[in-house]
């Protein structure tokens, strides 16, 4: 019932290392098939289940099944890139079902890629030239953080589960226009009011006149405060962390999540981080917010770069031609 409420555009079924546990993925697939959703299904689990999946989602009955290599083929090994590519292919083939998109397909001869996916493609290309990096895209509705980096040897010894080399997180509550009230709530209304007062303007007045593209000095200052919160929160959520665990032999340290300590470059793209006056200082906050020392965030050595021409998403699409 919950799946029908969500009305997903695509379902990914995974689970079970190759030649390991089979039953859970099969049971989930049968339940999904019984819902008669008529949407693409991607299977990226135990290789032994592939034939079973073809029987559950028969092509001759109009089912759209994509079978891809296991995302978790063996313990402590991730293999996400083949699955990522197939999801992109499924998106392209089915995007024309969205209102108005059939006309876009008629005009476009190349690939159609959602903006976060396009920015990730560009980020992976930049990695080949620059090395370890993260890219931040603060928009009106979301804040996306893309990282392509390998964990340090020190952190690798502490990791309790693997992380992909290329990772993207999309924070749906950290947009600086559509979701501005959620960012205000994240900062704290009283704290934000005081920050605005220190900069010589009224928070209430700035929010009353607030628009998608700031025009006045007050609006620009307010957007910068919201953007700083979005950037820091997105980085904290994306980054892994160290954690203490206690056992018979005493306390030990483990690492969970994505290690960003090797990142050499922090890149800003999107409307806010390509246009705001203090965009570089805002991004620099990522390297200063790790007060506990337990977050695996970039250090002060990281350099700040800005996509001044706002072309990373376009370059990501062009790279797929």
Predicted regions and their residues:
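Glycine-rich phosphate-binding loop plus the immediately following alpha-helix
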Residues: 38, 112-114, 158-233, 299-320
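Glycine-rich phosphate-binding loop of actin/hexokinase-like ATP-binding domains
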Residues: 124, 128-198, 277-301
